[in-house]
Amino acid sequence: MKELEYPFDNGFIMKKKRSLKRQLLGDGAVRLKKRVAVLGGSTTDDIVSVLELFLLDMGFECEFYRSEYGQFWQDAVFSNEELDRFKPDIVYIHTSLRNLSFSPTPRSGEEEIEQGLNAELDRLSQAWDLSLIH
């Protein structure tokens, strides 16, 4: 679909996402079905709706699981019956700066920053590794 080719107009895509989806679903293409879990640290509705368009255009028809707002960590690390039943083929962890536990200050020393960064990477790696188990 031309509208989804680079360089694309993200404002147009957001405005016309429903009609673009109808066009893609109505084109008669055979698509591979996949289940995608989107574990979000922030609102993921727009991410999912746009991701769905690009995946449809690339030949994938996806069913999506969305974590509750800010629950990416809990869904990834702890057992979640709904997510377990969903059995995702793909897990996408959508986080932002707000989801970081460590926040250095201008007075933070190099060692403190290094330790904080390593702890943050360990935490995110744990979420990623455990999300793959579900």
Q: Where in the sequence are the language-model features?
A:
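Oxyanion-hole/transition-state-stabilizing segment in secreted/luminal serine hydrolases
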Residues: 76-124
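Conserved small/polar residues in nucleotide/adenosyl-binding loops
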Residues: 133-134
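Short alpha-helical segments and helix-capping/turn motifs at coil-helix boundaries
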Residues: 22-23, 49, 72-81, 124-130
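A short beta-strand-loop structural module common to alpha/beta enzyme folds
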Residues: 58-73
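Glycine-rich, histidine-containing beta strand-loop boundary motifs that form or position
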Residues: 40, 66, 94-95
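N-terminal secretory targeting modules
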Residues: 1-38, 44-61
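Conserved aromatic-histidine-acidic binding/catalytic patches
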Residues: 35, 39-43, 112-119
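Short, solvent-exposed loop/turn segments at secondary-structure junctions
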Residues: 43-45, 70-71, 96-100
